[in-house]
Amino acid sequence: KLKVNIRKAAREGAELVVLQELHNGLYFCQTEDTSMFDLAETIPGPSTETFGALAKELGIVLVLSLFEKRAPGLYHNTAVVLEKDGTIAGKYRKMHIPDDPAYYEKFYFTPGDLGFEPIDTSVGRLGVLVCWDQWYPEAARLMAMRGAEMLIYPTAIGWESSDTQEEKDR
């Protein structure tokens, strides 16, 4: 379904498509479960190959959000920007990692170490951050000061499973 919708967006004129945080499956950080580490992948890896080929086929810039396995015991929540030719233009590792009820990300992810550097692409200079980074204005400020023309935040936040139906409908 994801590829179908990416193709649809490209057909309708999208030059940049941003996927949600940790898009390869459901957001899994509501619990601490060691079996989830099996979902992590290297960068480059299977997702960057698959979606890189799709970006090249469609001539779009594509922003992925992946559970990165950098080394044994070292994992990140990483956004990867794929250029129109399918190559990796750059990546950003989520810096601010929540540890709140239903957001046990510190169990899974190490804070990023790449700094706040915009990524140059054919659609502009992208300031790519991830989800909870939006609550820390210095991240956006640093990206803007370094020339980001657009801020992008892949996110999985929607509503809490414990919210009332009235709140979800709001």
Kindly give the residue locations of the regions a language model identified.
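Active-site catalytic loop in hydrolytic enzyme cores
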Residues: 41, 53, 70-170
